[in-house]
Amino acid sequence: MPLALRQPGTVLPLSLADCYQGPFEHFTPPLTGGAVPHGAIKASRWRNAALLEEDMACYASRYPGGDKRAIASLWSKWHFSTVTVPTLIAHLLLNRDLPVGLDDLYVIQNEDGCAQGLWLPHEGERFTTQDITERFATLIEQHWAPLIERLSAISGAAPRVFWSNAGGYVDYYVNTLAAHPLVNQEALAATRALLESRTLNGQRNPLFEPVRTYQPSGSEEVKRVRKLCCLRYLLDEFDVCGNCPLEGCDRQARRKG
């Protein structure tokens, strides 16, 4: 890569799609501009709980009679991952604020009803601040907050479950991008501060420490564990995941509870 790309203050001559290399080469970059793909879902629909439930019906049909909390949580994980990857790539490599508010983007779902891609009207605007409240306002205030409110309403799962899902992906992908040769170090510090700050904009930060580390007794391994369970164990098709805080608990009893 040209050295100029690494110099602070330099406008990187890269498109968003150009950044999908290395650990992200198997991900699909968002479509930007042009015609909206046939069948793509306007995300602003999800401000309406009934329409959100309608658009989740295909995914929910995979688990007939399944716990709504777990179904909504797993659906959200697909969605949050699909949104988080391009948002963080744009933040950390291009210093750009993608138009990922619910009113701006369209979501492309696969045949199972899971998010697999996005359509964006453009590739965003260049950031002029490292303030975490301002840098993440589009993602948090215009997308995650209203969507999580609706997901909680239709499923009965606590909002903190969905915030934990979202924060877990921020934690994972920011650590992946930290090793990228073109990462903007100031933007990286700001993103990590998002996960390390107890408050955000004067209020409790729902993304605070979504993943924690601990060393199991008698082991030299340092393990990363989610702060909150994603509830997937409530579906008969799943056990807990590898970084679940409930590992080792009586999950059958929890299901009955």
Predicted ranges, named:
Residues 52-221:
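Hydrophobic, aromatic-lined core segments that form the binding pocket/scaffold
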Residues 226-251:
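Local cysteine-cluster metal-coordination motifs and their immediate loop/turn environment
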